Amino acid sequence: MTEQTQDENKLIAERRAKLEHIRTNCPANGHPNNFDRKHKAADIQAEFGHNTKEELEGMGIERSIAGRVMAKRGPFLVIQDVSGRIQAYAGKDVQKDLKEKFLGLDIGDIIGVTGQLHLSGKGDLYVNMEEYQLLTKALRPLPEKFHGLTDQETRYRQRYVDLIVNEDSREAFIMRSKVVSAIRNFMVKKEFMEVETPMMHSIPGGASARPFETHHNALDIAMYLRIAPELYLKRLVVGGFERVFEINRNFRNEGLSPRHNPEFTMMEFYMAYADFNDLMDLTEEMLSSIATELCGSPQLPYGEHTVDFGGPYARLSMLDAIKKYNPDNATIQSMTYEEVKDVEFMRDLAKSLGMTVEKFWTCGQLLEEIFGETAETQLMQPTFITGYPADISPLARRNDDNHFITDRFEFFIGGREVANGFSELNDAEDQDSRFKAQVDAKDAGDDEAMFYDADYITALEHGLPPTAGQGIGIDRLVMLFTNTHTIRDVILFPAMRPQAN
């Protein structure tokens, strides 16, 4: 046991002893639930922060606050609520009473205070403690500071502690809530209907990913947590709902990284009588308006860069992007789609770039992997990458001029993918063939290949109108709006490896 742990255990024991005293001498077993908090710290600061000491004394303003004790400075307590901080003043008689009733207050305790509002000699607003209650006794002490790797782990494992002591974390999650609300409002104004589709699927589909598997006892069948809502949302478009969207969780049984969490939030939407160009236009409008609404400007700081959401956004094909960011590679500079279709040529090119090549990779997979290896991280400004090969886009419509590629894009900012969209494949027979190719790929060892979904083929046979659809990764988007560089900083309770003990 470390010295720090011994000290913490001693403090916890002291606080437990105080709680026993409180239970004996205070009503409600030391946990009252009848305090009427009427005011918030930030509202008080905004309304009276400009008044002088004399003005406040003449006004006789009474305020009722509640929150957590974050600091003790002589007779002053710093009280924190959801909106901010304000001080409370405990005179000598109050301090004596606090000692008798509660054996004194500790940092972390939650209290309610009612009294006159005053201004201290240092110019800080405070509420005089005329009426007060200890609402919750904190048994564990708060950490003094968060720094270093160990404390990073604590931030994620004990997010409740992080939110108490770390204002930046609180602000990040407040911004997350605002981003989600702004997206929802934007979609509703564009006449999209919000829907909810199943979270458990009998056949996982809508993306290339490993699913989480479970078992439904009553039906005695295997079920999968959804990897994407796409196929259900398109069934709704078949049914006549021409504009639908869903903001919800997806689950993918894959690794952890600064960009990946096994459960994550997506906003996925579909619009009939539109194509992938319409999606790109809508995405520009959405992100530009949301950035301006929430941040006052379409230009946001991100690390050493400034990301400009104002538009227009760059648009280039995957092949052109590879050429752009490999200017000194003669083979890449002269590469054509005919060569991209040659799997041996692509395998040799990937190996020449120092890449490890899986035996089941197709031409399209090789092109995408080369793009990811050499170009993706260069895309700091908002950029639409188009020209995705059909063999890695099993749900997207083929391009009319070049059947090797599809009318699909992925949207990149800050060197990472944030969204994926395309003109939907509504040819039931073509979709049937592509599903079968995915089954063959799975048999060849690609465990992220899709399953065959016969009911979805049946839905397409009823007729899907020309449709475009897109998914936006909410977590990665929020990372940009909060200038954070790991997905764990924008997910309240991220997945963590089990602790040794």
From Swiss-Prot:
Residues that bind Mg(2+) 1: E410, E417
Could you say which cofactors this protein requires?
Answer: Mg(2+)
Q: Which GO terms describe its molecular function?
A: ATP binding; lysine-tRNA ligase activity; magnesium ion binding; tRNA binding
Query: Which keywords does the record carry?
Result: Aminoacyl-tRNA synthetase, ATP-binding, Cytoplasm, Ligase, Magnesium, Metal-binding, Nucleotide-binding, Protein biosynthesis
Identify the main location.
cytoplasm
Q: What reactions does this protein catalyze? A: tRNA(Lys) + L-lysine + ATP = L-lysyl-tRNA(Lys) + AMP + diphosphate
| CDD domains in the record | LysRS_core, LysRS_N
Q: What class of enzyme is it?
A: ligase
Compartments where located = Cytoplasm
Task: Show the GO cellular component annotation of the record.
Answer: cytosol
GO biological process per UniProt: lysyl-tRNA aminoacylation
Q: EC number(s) for this protein?
A: 6.1.1.6
Q: How does the cofactor bind to this protein, according to its record?
A: Binds 3 Mg(2+) ions per subunit.
* InterPro entries to which the protein is assigned, alphabetical: Aa-tRNA-synt_II, aa-tRNA-synth_II, aa-tRNA-synth_II/BPL/LPL, Lys-tRNA-ligase_II, Lys-tRNA-ligase_II_N, Lys-tRNA-synth_II_C, NA-bd_OB-fold, NA-bd_OB_tRNA
Which residues does the annotation say bind Mg(2+) 2?
Answer: E417
- Keyword check for Nucleotidyltransferase: no
Q: Which family does the entry's similarity section mention?
A: Belongs to the class-II aminoacyl-tRNA synthetase family.
Oligomeric and partner information = Homodimer.
State what protein this is by name: Lysine--tRNA ligase
What is the native source organism of this protein?
Shewanella pealeana (strain ATCC 700345 / ANG-SQ1)
**What lineage does UniProt assign to this protein's organism?**
Bacteria, Pseudomonadati, Pseudomonadota, Gammaproteobacteria, Alteromonadales
